[in-house]
């Protein structure tokens, strides 16, 4: 089985587009469709034909290009069953535990409500990668537009249980702002300090901070660390449960 090829590129103001390509079958999937024109151009430059669209959730900056790309390529749209009435052009509805294929490469569907109630992520264990949409960000997590803190914490906990080396492809370049907030919550964390300095350098050079890894996020992302004694002490929540601490971190980020 050939190595999966990944093409990452900026879309809109701060989204990332991702094309994944299996050389053996010639199949190509776009992860979400933030900007149809940009995605189609990237596929054309690579010499790839888009055969699948994998949607993570219904927001326009993730599914807004579905109809254009589908009309021009005939691509099959894979999307969460919960969003059957909110995402256009669905060919295959998926839910937690389903497995989809791109050639011989397999992706397991994780249902991850929180940011939205239909959100899913796509974990490709043989390739050591996961496409997580707006659930987990580098040093952050998605805003809770539809779900509860409890639902988001459960979703993040599932992602945190993936192998440490898993490369995490999140859908937005938010890391600089996330780092500033993380340092306000966990200022003495050496791993976070190193990570934040690295991010500052990458962004100064115009480089992406995505992908990240599960290991890096578990060490530095406060949204995955509500059990940390230093964070709990700073919040005055030494005796609260992880879910409550997570909810308070999210509340503070919303007004940061």
UniProtKB/Swiss-Prot annotation:
Binds 2 Zn(2+) ions per subunit. Pathway: Secondary metabolite metabolism; methylglyoxal degradation; (R)-lactate from methylglyoxal: step 2/2. Zn(2+) 2 binds at residues 61-62, 134, 172. GO terms for biological process: methylglyoxal catabolic process to D-lactate via S-lactoyl-glutathione. InterPro entries: Clx_II_MBL (IPR035680), Glyoxalase_II_hydrolase (IPR050110), HAGH_C (IPR032282), Hydroxyacylglutathione_Hdrlase (IPR017782), Metallo-B-lactamas (IPR001279), RibonucZ/Hydroxyglut_hydro (IPR036866). Its EC number is 3.1.2.6. Zn(2+) 1 binds at residues 57, 59, 115, 134. One of its GO terms (molecular function) is hydroxyacylglutathione hydrolase activity. It comes from the Bacteria. Its cofactor is Zn(2+). CDD domains: hydroxyacylglutathione_hydrolase_MBL-fold. It catalyses: an S-(2-hydroxyacyl)glutathione + H2O = a 2-hydroxy carboxylate + glutathione + H(+). It is an enzyme of class 3 (hydrolase). Keywords: Hydrolase, Metal-binding, Zinc. Belongs to the metallo-beta-lactamase superfamily. Glyoxalase II family. Thiolesterase that catalyzes the hydrolysis of S-D-lactoyl-glutathione to form glutathione and D-lactic acid. Monomer. This is Hydroxyacylglutathione hydrolase.
């Amino acid at each position: 089985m050939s190595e999966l090829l990944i093409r990452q590129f900026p879309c809109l103001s701060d989204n990332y587009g991702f094309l994944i390509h299996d050389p053996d079958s010639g199949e190509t999937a776009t992860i979400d469709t933030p900007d149809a024109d940009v995605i189609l151009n990237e596929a054309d430059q690579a010499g790839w034909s888009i055969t699948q669209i994998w949607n993570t959730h219904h927001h326009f900056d993730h599914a807004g290009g579905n109809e254009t790309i589908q009309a021009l390529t005939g691509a099959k749209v894979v999307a969460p069953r919960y969003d059957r009435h909110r995402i256009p052009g669905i060919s295959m509805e998926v839910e937690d535990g389903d497995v989809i294929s791109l050639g011989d490469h397999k992706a397991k569907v994780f249902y991850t409500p929180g940011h939205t109630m239909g959100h899913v992520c796509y974990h490709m264990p043989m390739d050591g990668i996961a496409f997580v949409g707006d659930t987990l960000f580098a040093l952050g997590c998605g805003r809770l537009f539809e779900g509860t803190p409890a639902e988001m914490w459960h979703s993040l906990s599932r992602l945190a249980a993936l192998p440490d080396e898993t490369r995490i492809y999140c859908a937005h370049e938010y890391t600089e702002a996330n780092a500033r907030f993380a340092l306000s919550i966990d200022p003495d964390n050496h791993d976070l300090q190193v990570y934040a300095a690295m991010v500052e350098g990458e962004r100064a050079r115009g480089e992406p901070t995505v992908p990240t890894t599960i290991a890096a996020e578990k060490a530095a992302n406060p949204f995955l660390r509500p059990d940390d004694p230093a964070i709990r002490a700073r919040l005055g929540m030494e005796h609260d449960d992880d879910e409550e601490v997570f909810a308070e971190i999210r509340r503070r980020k919303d007004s940061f």
